[in-house]
Structures are given as structure tokens and as C-alpha cells.
Amino acid sequence: MVTVTVDKNENLEKALKRFKRMIEKEAIIREWKRREYYEKPSTIRVKKEKAFKRKQAKKVRKLKQKTNR
């Protein structure tokens, strides 16, 4: 659980920014969005395979660019 204590002299907007940073650091929003809707295991597997292929293609493109220089 993320908690932020606001001091008497502290600006509220500064505390809000600190809160947002803490949430991003703990990846709460990302996890919430991931679990918002049920995904079948097969759908998850297909997404992971597509992401892997995209990353591999990107690595190949970068490698080709380096060798062409």
C-alpha cells in the first residue's frame, strides 16, 4: 500500500507528484490495467509470442544498420 505523509509546510501539489512517482515505481496502475479484464491463457501466450517476434525483428534491424555503416 502506498502512503504519503504531507508535512505542514509542504505544498499539496508536491505531495501529489511524490504519490504519483511512488505508484509508478510500484507499477500499481500497470498491474491494475493488466488484471482489469480476464484474458485466456492462450491469448496471453499469443501476445507474448508476438512481442518476442517484434523484439527480435527490431534487434535484427539494428544489427543490419550497424553493419551497413
UniProtKB/Swiss-Prot annotation:
Gene Ontology annotations for the cellular component aspect, listed alphabetically: ribonucleoprotein complex; ribosome
Pfam families per record: Ribosomal_S21 (PF01165)
Keywords on record: Ribonucleoprotein, Ribosomal protein
InterPro entries: Ribosomal_bS21 (IPR001911), Ribosomal_bS21_CS (IPR018278), Ribosomal_bS21_sf (IPR038380)
Gene Ontology BP, a term: translation
Stretches the record annotates as Disordered: 50-69
One MF annotation (Gene Ontology) recorded for this entry: structural constituent of ribosome
Keyword Chaperone: no
Similarity remark: Belongs to the bacterial ribosomal protein bS21 family.
Protein name: Small ribosomal subunit protein bS21
Lineage per the UniProt record: Bacteria, Pseudomonadati, Spirochaetota, Spirochaetia, Spirochaetales
Gene symbol of the encoding locus: rpsU
